[in-house]
Amino acid sequence: MTLRTLYQTLLDSDMARLHVIAQQWDITVVAERKPDVAAELADAMAHAEAVERVLADLDDAARAALDDLLRHNGALPWAIFIRRWGELRAVGPGRLEREELWREPVSAVERLWYLGLVQRAFATWAGGQVEMAFVPEELSLYMPVAVPLDVVPPKPAPPPAQQIAGTDVLADDLVTLFAALQMETLNPAAANEKTAWMRLPQASALLETLALEQGWLQRDERDALRPVAEPMLAWLQVDGWSQWAALARAWMESARWNDLAAVPTLHPDPVREWPVDPRAARQAFLDLVRHCAPDTWYALVEFIAFVREQNMDVLRPDGDYDVWALRDAATDRPLRGIEAWDVVEGAWIAFVLTGPLFWLGMVDLDNEPVTCFRLSAAGAALLELGAPPALPEPPPLRLSEDGVIGVPLRRRYARFQVRRIAQPLTWDEDYRYRLTPTSLTLARQQRIPVTRILAFLAEATGQALPAHLRSAIESVYQGRETARLEQVWLLRVPDPAVLEHPALRRFIRESLGEGMALIHAADRAKVVAVLARNGILPETDIR
């Protein structure tokens, strides 16, 4: 990382420090003016032999601190550097010369500082201006490449007795979202499917954010979500693994979705809200997850400790734990300083593992309460640690003789098409829909030809369409009157004249004969009230 030149950094130093550096490098300075002294020093220091001689005199701690900088391209935020390698005392030039403090440095940082091997300057880092510790490039050119540190992976845990496999059902929820948004413009009741038909309702906010970011959805002039046909269909028509991977990678690369803002135990900083680069933090975290072996279980607490050991600044790359403070969701207490690491960073790590990574099927978990996890085959593949899992081909659609369509999981394009022509019934192991006059009328409003419906059903089921269903579908499309099955109540009264009462007559759907009438199920309570006001307490037979 190129910051300031060696000469510029020396020019910013006071004369006392320049004399200390010259003395320790065994450089005789002739000049008296600071610019000239800085120039002489920079000239004499930037030589291989001079750098090699100074490095040979470093103690182990100072060499380790210098190597730490070199492993990070020669620069680290000053706050992180001094936290790792010790303080630099704030002293004036008089005390420095009088007490000769460089002879007994209190830390590795102080040793490197008075040698001039480490300098300080502000630079753009993690989206802001941050004070950096760095090795001037004129010196680092002559330094050996630091040996990479071996990362000790997290300690494995025993397999739990109960395991919950991460799967690709979030992709099925995306189809539910597409279908509901597509249909609600014709039938507002379809909006209920966005909650009632979600297998992972807790992931709905993530799903909407990713779909918008990927261009599968957009907001219309009324700010309502609407599918974007071409990219949506492109996703629907690829194979199951490609759909799964596209959704997972959308999260991995997302700049809009902020995992920290979704942690339920945290509230935002009152001023800075959620001052974290969500994508950069996620990428740094996933780099640590890559140290987990596939198909190996790890305790959450052990992995959180591993993150703290390897990259505790994963959320705060500037190393500053005081510049912003989230709030405890329960008490509104400010969570400031490194002492709050477990309740901020620790909570974020646990949420990402048990939330998005699990929702996307990248990890498996144990049962509630969650205490451990492992990378799934899909997670290993997405993190480039293994091959993609082999997904079995889902069976064809099933069409019963009464017009109920069963759609297996992963038949996503077919399910989107089915929802355009059929009403949703229920879901568990698969999704079930029913062909009805209302659903087929809506299909006609979408200008779906009846021939296309018949061909689709035959192709998707792999069987010839039963003649009676073909006839029923064609009958609706031709506008013929059809049967209707309704939920009604039968009202019996001893005096037929009661049914002629104006307050009651408006609720009668159909008269059946002497003292009997049908009323709509939704009007039952109103009819009971009318009868009571007229001196009749009805008996209701509910079985």
Q: What does each of the following model-derived ranges do?
A:
Residues 1-338, 343, 351, 359-360, ...:
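Type-3 copper protein
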Residues 162-171, 237-543:
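Extended alpha-helical interface modules used as scaffolds for assembling large macromolecular complexes
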